[in-house]
Amino acid sequence: MNIIEIENVSKTFERVKIEEGLINSFKSLFKREKVKVTALSDVSFKVKEGKIIGLIGANGAGKSTLMKAMVGLIKPTSGTILVNGFNPHDKKNDFLKSIGVVLGQKNQLWWDLSPYETFLLHKEIYELSDTEFKKNVDELAKNLGVLEILKSPVRNLSLGERMKCELIASILHSPKILFLDEPTIGLDFLAQKNIRNFLKNYCKERNTTVVITSHYFPDIYELCEELIILKNGEVVFNNNFKKIKEEIKSYKYIYLSFENEIDSQDLKKYGEVKESDTFSVTIKVQEKLVNETISSILKEFNVIDYNLTEMSSQDLIEDIYSMESTGVKITV
């Protein structure tokens, strides 16, 4: 069952164009030239219930715009969006009760109140019974390790504690779909890991659908089953993330140090040159060709030293952003 259906969605914004100079600034007070900016262009995809989907792209790719359209904060210029069978922009109560939203740079918690007082407000908004409210708060706070700080003012909490409480506020009503926009932004490594582990277990137990955007790639790499990549407002990749991981595992980096000056162009026949300087080159080759490649290079060049390394998460995301098609093959 598809719980999210996006079909041919586009979104354009109008911006005022202001020319440089005092005279042009004065003219703009009376006549403003407007330009259209395309944030989303003919975006289509479907999400099955219970899946964790990663939505990634460079800054300005359209991730936040698409996320806001899916939760009903903005209306698309054209196309249709169905989330749990609802048009998000209608903001029907049943729809709002079926989603949870965490925006990493926008707080739900009141600065001078305790998280628990915000939870009480959400209890009334989502019409939770006393029993359900207590059960959910106790369970979520225990799993996230924040039981002891629920009644402390938000201003006295660390960033990690606040973000965990933000997460509780968003899922207190047991939503079917959870939208996470940069949920671990600014957090330390341990806090990020704790939130990821919690989300894995929570979503598995409750079959919750999750759409997550993040520039911190371990969030995507460790949580997501499928990946959607946006580039300039368009979907350039929509596929199972496991296939990408398997593809990446089939590559190795070979770092080579040479006795004499080397022209990196001479190494291109052996693999993709990733880095180079006067006396060293790093190339990317398929794992099955590593031994053959090293043997051939040693015969042709005076190599002082070489070593092999795995592709890192950062390497992976750079390769993914450089994909030119919707296939699994990586082409950087």
What name fits each language-model region?
Residues 23-28, 120, 124, 131-149:
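Conserved ABC ATPase "signature" region
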